[in-house]
């Protein structure tokens, strides 16, 4: 049992080192790659640790069910999100919303109209920012853009365009099969459809260039 645990730990550390080597040189000094320690975490996500440090967290138990090429493209998707500055951040919105609501209740008690308006205004601004951050259409658009950039990153590491598209597409197909959450599965399906359209455009563009 102990030897099995040791072998698993070594395999996980080896995979984390391998993923670290897939970071572009300009990111290697400030982007960390670690195994997730949460209960039922997402497959892969990024978290801002400080102003100049980001950690990519991987659920290694689920991760090992994917082929190497699938892992690579999903990892580069996350890298692309970091490069595009679209990873989720712990913002001021929730704190501002709590302060605004608390202030509104307090000003209702003391009946100060101006301060009540200010508190309600703070609630409105922070609530709108929270809505923007969690807007489904915006998030899927950012994900599709990151998929495109992941393809480009793959070519920097030796993939041909057809192989990069094929690897990411097969990753989506696997995730669609393995994801029980209907909403999450729908997002993967949408991204797969967008990827197919992009691949078709790229193929047509390549064939046109060859014909010239």
UniProtKB/Swiss-Prot annotation:
Bilayer-spanning residue ranges? 109-131
What are the GO cellular component annotations? plasma membrane-derived thylakoid membrane
Q: How does it sit in the membrane?
A: Single-pass membrane protein
Q: What is this protein called?
A: Thylakoid membrane protein slr1949
Q: Sorted alphabetically, which InterPro entries does this protein's record hold? A: DUF3318
Q: Keywords of this protein's UniProt record, alphabetized? A: Coiled coil, Membrane, Thylakoid, Transmembrane, Transmembrane helix
Please give the organism: Synechocystis sp. (strain ATCC 27184 / PCC 6803 / Kazusa)
Q: Name the coiled-coil region(s).
A: 180-212
Q: What is its main location?
A: membrane
The cellular location(s) given in this protein's UniProt record come to: Cellular thylakoid membrane
Annotated Pfam families: DUF3318
Is the keyword Transport assigned to this protein? no
Lineage top rank: taxon? Bacteria
């Amino acid at each position: 049992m102990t030897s099995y645990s040791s072998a698993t730990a070594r395999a996980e550390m080896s995979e984390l080192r391998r993923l670290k080597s897939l970071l572009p040189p300009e990111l290697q000094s400030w982007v960390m790659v670690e195994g997730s320690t949460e209960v039922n975490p997402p497959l892969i996500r990024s978290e801002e640790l400080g102003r100049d440090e980001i950690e990519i967290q991987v659920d290694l138990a689920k991760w090992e069910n994917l082929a190497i090429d699938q892992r690579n493209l999903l990892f580069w998707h996350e890298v692309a999100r970091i490069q595009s500055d679209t990873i989720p951040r712990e913002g001021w919105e929730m704190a501002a919303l709590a302060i605004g609501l608390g202030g509104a209740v307090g000003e209702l008690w003391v009946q100060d109209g101006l301060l009540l308006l200010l508190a309600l205004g703070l609630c409105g601004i922070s609530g709108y920012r929270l809505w923007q951050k969690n807007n489904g259409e915006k998030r899927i658009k950012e994900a599709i853009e990151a998929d495109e950039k992941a393809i480009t990153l793959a070519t920097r590491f030796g993939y041909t365009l057809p192989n990069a598209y094929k690897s990411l597409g097969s990753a989506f197909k696997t995730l669609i099969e393995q994801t029980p959450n209907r909403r999450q599965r729908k997002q993967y399906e949408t991204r797969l459809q967008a990827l197919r359209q992009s691949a078709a455009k790229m193929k047509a563009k390549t064939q046109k260039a060859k014909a010239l």
